[in-house]
């Protein structure tokens, strides 16, 4: 699967009409066959899962599943679906307002600032009113722009929405992607560049979504980077390297050590699973998610 196109497709489509429920095996039955009722977790890591990676399930069924797995959050949910989460007592651990949001057309483009400022000015109060904290944003692609200019442009645009974010207690989080494989030409592809953006903005309400999978591909050195820059990281995503699949022994990252490093920083936010499951059956995919959570539950 082409990961970048899948993610872009999700961001464009999820805000449209909800996925119609079709004939799926009962998630209650699938979950019960793989775990005890309401899995007990250790509590040091706040676990979440990105909806788009389990989008074959209607959101209602995904909510039932995550509750049985002991989770209380799902990532990357648009406002139209927040009532469904709330009905199940689940929070949105990372919000986005679809609109014209784009991974490739972002804050490094001054010509897009008026549009982005308008969209985020509308979105920030919505997030706060729903009781949520995190709202995703993107740098955009370089398209020939050098990193210094891109940094300057991002600062100029983002600083215009930070007072509103601070007023409402909403944290704007820029996601880091690899530009080698999945998101070629994406600007925020290095943690050092993104940390400098945080420093120049100087707001506690701007942080980074540190995607462990993406940063392993682009720069490695994951644990040291987390330890030295954790104050700028407001959210984490996981996936196996290579392939962006399960985080088990089939890939190169040792997630228990990474999770322990995160816990040792005093981090209280969410870690969201964002791998693409390889299981052929729903039962296998449910078991894989349970295993991923167990691996990260240090």
Write out the residue ranges for each language-model feature:
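Short acidic, glycine/proline-enriched helix-loop-strand junctions
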Residues: 83-96, 154, 170
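Histidine-acidic metal/acid-base catalytic patches
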Residues: 2-67, 131-133, 188-210, 214-298
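Catalytic domains of carbohydrate-active enzymes, especially glycoside hydrolases
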Residues: 62-81
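Active-site-proximal loop/turn and secondary-structure-junction residues that shape catalytic pockets
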Residues: 53-55, 78-80, 98-100, 141-143, ...
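Active-site acidic/histidine proton-transfer and metal-coordination neighborhood
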Residues: 13-26, 41, 109-207, 217
């Amino acid at each position: 699967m082409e990961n970048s196109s899948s993610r872009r497709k999700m961001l464009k489509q999820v805000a449209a009409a909800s996925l119609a429920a079709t004939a799926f095996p009962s998630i209650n039955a699938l979950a019960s066959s793989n775990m005890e009722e309401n899995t007990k977790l250790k509590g040091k890591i706040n676990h979440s899962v990105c909806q788009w990676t389990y989008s074959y399930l209607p959101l209602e069924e995904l909510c039932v599943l995550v509750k049985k797995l002991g989770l209380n959050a799902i990532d990357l949910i648009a406002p139209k679906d927040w009532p469904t989460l709330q009905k199940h007592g689940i929070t949105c651990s990372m919000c986005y307002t679809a609109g014209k949001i784009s991974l490739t057309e972002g804050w490094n483009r001054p010509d897009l600032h008026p549009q982005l400022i308008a969209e985020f000015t509308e979105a920030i109060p919505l997030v706060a009113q729903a009781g949520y904290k995190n709202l995703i944003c993107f740098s955009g692609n370089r398209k020939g722009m050098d990193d210094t200019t891109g940094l300057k442009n991002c600062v100029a645009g983002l600083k215009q929405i930070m007072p509103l974010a601070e007023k409402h207690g909403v944290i704007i989080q820029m996601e880091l992607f690899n530009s080698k494989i999945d998101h070629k030409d994406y600007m925020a592809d290095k943690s050092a560049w993104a940390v400098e953006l945080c420093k120049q903005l100087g707001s506690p309400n701007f942080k980074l979504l540190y995607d462990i999978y993406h940063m392993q591909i682009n720069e490695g050195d994951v644990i040291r980077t987390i330890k030295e820059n954790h104050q700028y990281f407001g959210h984490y995503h996981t996936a196996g390297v290579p392939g962006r699949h399960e985080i088990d022994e089939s890939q190169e990252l040792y997630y228990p050590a990474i999770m322990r490093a995160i816990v040792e920083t005093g981090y209280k936010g969410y870690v969201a699973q964002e791998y693409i499951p390889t299981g052929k059956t729903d039962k296998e995919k449910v078991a894989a998610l349970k295993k991923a959570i167990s691996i990260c539950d240090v």
